């Protein structure tokens, strides 16, 4: 059975666990006498082999407040691990990423609260998530979570960060707890029609998102609030097709795809000079993508697709048009002859005539008819960046090939 084959690949071995424990020993020595806990998928036993980020949370009394975490707590942690290979990262508040033996350890300051619904920062709920999941999943259930995570990774809908807008690890765990196993999740997801409500606990507020899973440890929060409708639809379609024709392609899609260039494709390569929070950068990138598409349509271009990909430092925006060539002039459709606005139209326009339909028309010059210029003007990044732009001529990297192909390999 395909699921058993996949599990052999993704389930960590005893050797893998020992390697992680060695890394954790180094961290434990550094954080000695602090109130800290290992959290995340490693602690819950739902982590994937060769895909390990360890989450270590350092807790401080809730009375010290959020500002304390950003300054004092962060400095306290840095002073203890400064001899290790570390970088600063940014979410709701800064945290530290330590790299030991190619294993990333996220060390996150948090506030110690009595229950998940008393959380002051988003990460304060984490130990309650861990407790809930470990008390509701047996060993087989953990393997079912692993299958669901790998399936979602394979089809590109895993990850709650703004760049992806997909399912978090916690969401996959709750789906398995609710439905029972991987296959049952797919069977139900294949029939989804939004709004979808999955209630392990009664919600404490009304949610408006397309997929609603109230958090069992904080029912005022929707665990899947960040999941986009596009990713819900993709998951539902993938579930339907996998159940019809199971294939390892869903879990590990082919990396090499070939596709010819259709239409005209503008490639914008952005290199960011400054480090910033991934969610902040990708919030601005997503706004840029929407703005570029709207602006091009307003100027008369027929837009096929606009997408972005990359990390926090190097980002590619691809713009696919039916054609990059557009006339310098365009037909401006005016009011009917009996309209009260005809004088205003005549005053503001040249080359005016009355059409056979009794409507006024004019010829107008476009303010801008170069797609590359329009696209560049509508990038709204607030950090400094360098840009390289060109029209695609030849087949390039696989991400561009995926953009051109559109159809995921698991679908066709």
From Swiss-Prot:
Q: Please list the GO terms describing molecular function.
A: ATP binding; CCA tRNA nucleotidyltransferase activity; magnesium ion binding; tRNA binding
Catalysis: reaction(s):
a tRNA precursor + 2 CTP + ATP = a tRNA with a 3' CCA end + 3 diphosphate; a tRNA with a 3' CCA end + 2 CTP + ATP = a tRNA with a 3' CCACCA end + 3 diphosphate
Q: Which residues cross the membrane?
A: none
GO biological processes: RNA repair; tRNA 3'-terminal CCA addition
Entries under Gene3D superfamilies matching the protein: Beta Polymerase, domain 2, CCA tRNA nucleotidyltransferase, domain 2, Poly(A) polymerase predicted RNA binding domain
Enzyme Commission code(s) on record: 2.7.7.72
The answer, when asked if RNA-binding is one of the entry's keywords, is yes
Which residues take part in binding ATP? 41, 44, 129, 149, 158
What this protein needs as a cofactor is: Mg(2+)
Q: What else is known?
A: A single active site specifically recognizes both ATP and CTP and is responsible for their addition.
Q: Which UniProt keywords apply?
A: ATP-binding, Magnesium, Metal-binding, Nucleotide-binding, Nucleotidyltransferase, RNA repair, RNA-binding, Transferase, tRNA processing
> Binding residues for CTP, per the UniProt record?
41, 44, 129, 149, 158
> What name is this protein filed under?
CCA-adding enzyme
Function (record text): Catalyzes the addition and repair of the essential 3'-terminal CCA sequence in tRNAs without using a nucleic acid template. Adds these three nucleotides in the order of C, C, and A to the tRNA nucleotide-73, using CTP and ATP as substrates and producing inorganic pyrophosphate. tRNA 3'-terminal CCA addition is required both for tRNA processing and repair. Also involved in tRNA surveillance by mediating tandem CCA addition to generate a CCACCA at the 3' terminus of unstable tRNAs. While stable tRNAs receive only 3'-terminal CCA, unstable tRNAs are marked with CCACCA and rapidly degraded.
- Residue positions binding Mg(2+): 53, 55, 106
Tell me the subunit arrangement: Homodimer.
Q: Does the keyword Transferase apply?
A: yes
Alphabetical list of InterPro entries matching this protein: CAA_C, CCA-adding_arc, CCA_tRNA_nucleotrans_2, NT_2-5OAS_ClassI-CCAase, NT_sf, NuclTrfase_I-like_C, Polymerase_NTP_transf_dom, tRNA_NucTransf2
- Give a single Pfam family match: tRNA_NucTransf2
